[in-house]
Amino acid sequence: MSALMTCEPGRVIWITGLSGAGKSTLAHEVVARLRASGDVVVMLDGDDLREVFGAVSVDLKSHSRQARLALAIQYAHMCRILAQQSLTVVIATISLLKEVHAWNRENLPGYFEVYLKVPVEELRRRDPKGIYRRFDAGEITDVAGLDLAIDEPEAADWVAEFAQGRTVGVLTDELLNKLIEKQIV
């Protein structure tokens, strides 16, 4: 048995949603609160991971379904390695692919899937990275939820539907309460 497998398994909190949904914002707040309570937590962000794993890819700029799937499975494998070392992993990633959701449920210890469901109209209004503006201008393609089909999670452990005025603090409280209720943290 490998040394990784001798530890008590950790857990993976997988926060998914379209670009601009607030995944990273929520993840950072959840991580801060968990760390404040004494948990050892690793924060992973899909944008950072794309740079790390994509650096060895043939086409770093590709956002095709195939490229997204390959990267998301790599992210999931990294989460598993970390969770097998008794760590809590919080990951913020689009990864709206049924193959990823299924793989995660089957292979990640303490897996808890969060889906931030935000209408495209609201995402276009927020557009923190200019993705929706650039898509509308014809500058980019393969935008999840627009010209690239997504698979909404069918069995997310928690779905946070957009509500005007709902703050990240409120979302964080709701998520942490759900994690406690499900005995994830």
Where are these regions (language model features)?
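Conserved lysine of the Walker
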Residues: 23
